[in-house]
Amino acid sequence: MEMKYIVVEFESRDANGKHEVPILFANIIAHKGMYDSVSLAYRRYDHNCFVGNVLSAGFVSIDDKGKVTCWGESESLGGVKSRPARDALLISHLQNNWSSTNVNMHHLRDHAPLGT
């Protein structure tokens, strides 16, 4: 399964410090479009959270054994590059948290819309 991703810096008034949050999405959506949508949604609906800069962007694949590989850069964000090792670690952590809540990447992959 190959998808696009961005890692965005979030800061919450309720939580301590800043957090790097990976967001995975379908290849049909531009990196900038996803960032703009997330940023707008938080400005409108969550006044306790500030969406900061995009720290990295690119493409991600997750193989059948759960290995995460990140690469590339975003043209729509002006060449923001992926951070392969760090981003793979963040996404692996996200994947492990999903697995602990009975939602896993293999299930999502098997039910992904055509063309993603």
Predicted regions mapped to residue ranges:
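Intrinsic low-complexity, intrinsically disordered or marginally ordered coil/linker segments
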Residues: 1-88, 92-116
